[in-house]
Amino acid sequence: MKENSLKVASLFCGCGGSDLGTIGGFSFLEKDYTRLPFDIVYAVDFDTKAVETYNHNFEHPAVCADVCNVDFEKIPDVDMIIGGFPCQSFSTVNPTKDTNDDRAHLYKQIVRILHIKKPKVFICENVKGLLQLQYGAIIKRIAKEFEDEGYSVQFQLIKAVEFGVPQKRERVIIVGIRNDINFSYNFPSPLLKESDYVPLRKVIDKLALDNPKYYFSQKAVEGMKNAKNNMKRGLWQDLNGPSLTITSHLAKTSINSRDPVLLVDPDKEIYRRFTPREAARIQSFPDSFEFPVSDPYAYRQIGNAVPPVMMWYIASSVLGAFGYKPNTEVEHLIAPKHKQTKQLELWNMG
């Protein structure tokens, strides 16, 4: 960790998608997302397997604990908080959407750490459904509680596909800037129009074609086709466009589920699910990021993660709050992976 780096605490860190995007210094689809001046000094998550993956990939280990029981007085002082508070009760996939569910109140742990640590900036992520709950009253209530801790708060629906992620994933991003910081925040502008979206074929592993474990048996296909009462909508994928949103349920995917599947042979009705590595690429994880767990755990962690590439742009967009000025437009600061260049000094103080 550099002496003058900006210190970050990550709540609900999961396997580390947000953290990787915040730090930067990774490659994805022939592009290098340059190291940003952030360092994670504290990370916590309740999921033991997610923490196992996190600690396999990051220098600073995450703590496996219930964030509700963490004494924030005892963690390091930080410049920024990041956290994708659990969102099952807010998800459009969840038919219950019970706002009295305890999981719907975990954002209050963000409020609690803001009250104690007073960071200059915080970034939160949640599902699109949060905007729709009680006709927008829930997101406004959450924003008001953040504002009451002394922050100027903005939220916006961000489409990951517009930032080079090969997936039509939409997430609510909430950004707070402490009121005494002289910085007017703006969300990053979309970089790609629809005709330039990254297609799914760029992340599909041809080697998986020979691995039978990812294919649905013909018996399973016939059974799912005959279960008319359970049929929802088969989301087979067009390889020439971005993937539909992947979820944490990919290990249980069927041709009738809401998770995308690949139709390998239309004539023979041969289907397969994504491999964990393909799912990770769809989320914009670099191949260097490893998942040292079984497939079901990997699918869950990947589906719950924040796309690192999307988070890189969000993290870059708040640097002005810390006195940094970009040398040029952010999109010009991404170096082609194989181009031999010296390390870019992306941000200057002053």
Could you tell me what each predicted segment is?
Residues 70-80, 88-245:
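Class I S-adenosyl-L-methionine
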Residues 84, 121, 273-276:
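Short aromatic/basic micro-patch
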Residues 212-350:
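C-terminal target-recognition/interaction regions appended to catalytic cores
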Residues 15, 85-89, 191, 250, ...:
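Short, small-residue-rich loop/turn micro-motifs
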Residues 26, 85, 131-134, 146, ...:
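A generic secondary-structure signal for well-formed alpha-helical elements
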Residues 2-118, 128-132, 137-140:
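Core alpha/beta nucleotide-donor-binding catalytic domains of modification enzymes
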Residues 85-86, 119, 166, 286, ...:
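Proline-centered helix-kink/hinge sites
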